[in-house]
């Protein structure tokens, strides 16, 4: 410390660092930090089956078929955002969870999608319209 005092690490200390470096406002992890890490794991998006199991477990939703359909839409939106360089939002596991929870309340996946996965994917009205027509309405017709 600047005072000259030393703080000793407990021998059982484990430090976990997580980051979403591709999000706006986040930076790449500093090289000096990386060089001090013993293990580094990049965690990719889980497959649809894993997404469905996790979301059902967290939300208490029991409709596996509907949750799988919703997970497919989320995957399609994320891919469409990558392809068209829509980068002002997010569409992944947290958004899927929000959509499932909202749908459990509203009983209307389409309406719930508008205020969860679509709203989270982009703030731009044109981008949202594109995601609705190319991804959401392939599975949920209004």
Regions found by a protein language model. Name each.
Residues 1-142:
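C-terminal regulatory/interaction module of P-loop NTP-utilizing enzymes
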């Amino acid at each position: 410390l600047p005072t000259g005092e030393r703080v000793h690490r407990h021998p059982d200390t484990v430090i976990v660092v997580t980051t979403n470096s591709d999000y706006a406002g986040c930076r790449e992890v500093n090289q000096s930090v990386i060089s001090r890490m013993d293990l580094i794991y990049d965690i990719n998006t889980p497959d649809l089956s894993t997404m469905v199991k996790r979301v059902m477990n967290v939300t208490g939703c029991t409709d596996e078929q509907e949750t799988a359909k919703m997970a497919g839409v989320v995957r399609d939106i994320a891919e469409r955002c990558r392809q068209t360089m829509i980068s002002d939002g997010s569409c992944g596991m947290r958004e899927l969870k929000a959509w499932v929870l909202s749908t459990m309340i509203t009983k209307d996946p389409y309406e719930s999608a508008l205020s969860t996965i679509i709203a989270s994917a982009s703030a731009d009205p044109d981008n949202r319209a594109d995601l609705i027509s190319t991804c959401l309405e392939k599975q949920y017709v209004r």
